[in-house]
Amino acid sequence: MTEIIRTTLRDSKAARWTALLIVAFTMFAGYYLADVMSPLEGLLDKQLHWNSADYGWFTGAYGWFNVFLFFLIFGGIILDKMGIRFTGLTSAFVMVVGAAVKYWAVSTHMLDGMSWHIIFWSFPAQVWMAALGFAVFGVGVEVAGITVSKVIVKWFKGHELALAMGLQLAIARLGTALALSTSLPIAKAFGHVSAPILICLLMLCIGLLAFFVYNFQDKKLDASVVSSQEGLVIEPEEEFRMKDILNILGNKGWWYITILCALFYSAVFPFLKFATNLMILKYGVAENWAGSIPGLLPFGTIILTPFFGNLYDKKGKGASIMILGSIIIIFVHFLFSLSFLNHWSIAIFLMISLGIGFSLVPSAMWPSVPKIIPERQLGTAYALIFWVQNAVALMFVPAFIGWVLHKYCIVGSVIIDGEKMTQYNYTIPMLIFTSFGVLALVFAYLLKAEDKKKGYGLELPNVKS
């Protein structure tokens, strides 16, 4: 008897990697905008008179709608109910709208001299409007992120799943790296902080078009799946139900990954928001080059995240990889907190080390979620993880660090390039980041113990032999 070999479009390496590259560009553009203001804190102080509290408030606005209005969770439910194509296009469009509002707020003079008091907080009107645009953008980029995660699972499950997720993260972080290393020179070349934001806006428009292109690929994949099942008796796949949310929330392994994610990203993303000023004020790096040192971190992950993802695919040890990454995070931030270690070469060494830790944890964490959660619930499961991450790492922690710097860490002022800047002592913030690493290590061990108990297979390879 001859066995019929049934293949789908996802079995073509060229097809699945092409699909990945298309959606990865959209995330590249999104990550660029997410961090484009990070090296501009000093320039915002000089040109727009933003202090560290203003900057921290603006940075924390990224998660406002995702956290308080639950837009991210709704986005995950929409993804599971409406599908990848609808959700991907919608989220890419929302990113463009948010970027446009942010650009207008920073570039216009209509808001000059105005201050708004909303609920309990008073900030310049320009800060509020820029924060609003960033919050709208945050909805789009986070929903796009969970959509792309589900895209990768759809195309790569049973293949190079962790490698694909690692490469997507690497391409996205190339956007972060370029933002950190190019936004300040671009702003200075054009004479205003709004210039790099305009470039981001144009890139996001191209990213929106990229999702239109992906939709054709996705339709072809669905058609090939239907064709491969002709003549077979296929049980209908269970649809997502609202009670599945309770099943996700009742999964202890999911909680450990979620808390680990929030703690890990709390130790990295908020740090990057303030890292350029840290390089200038503590390590004496010239302002034009200060963003290049934090830019080493995402550049390192471009190589290392796919490498560790490929290692997880072939060798396993996902929980152990997350433990090692957490240990490196602790080591790096503790050394950053030591005031006598203030030479620029030490900053480079620590940033490269942080890049290794930053590569280890996500390369194993994101591909582990499909081992714990059924595929029909993945969109909502990722959305809930991202919601907690938004609430803690992307909203609360940046605002908290900005408040700590403004309240407890001002030690005077300094003249840089002929202009006055506030001088900060970064010891307390670095110790806060260190504590996040310690807690992340605890939950990484708890996850490994839960995997041993439940048999999720986090320590097993992803590629089917």
List PLM regions with ranges.
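Helix-to-loop junctions at the C-terminal end of transmembrane segments
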Residues: 69-84, 304-317, 405
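Juxtamembrane intracellular "pre-TM" segments in multi-pass secondary transporters
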Residues: 2-13, 222-257, 463-465
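Extracytoplasmic gate region of multi-pass secondary transporters
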Residues: 37-41, 251-305, 362, 366, ...
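C-terminal transmembrane helical hairpin of 12-TM major facilitator-type secondary transporters
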Residues: 318-365
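Glycine-rich segments within core transmembrane alpha-helices of 12-TM secondary carriers
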Residues: 162-188, 386-398
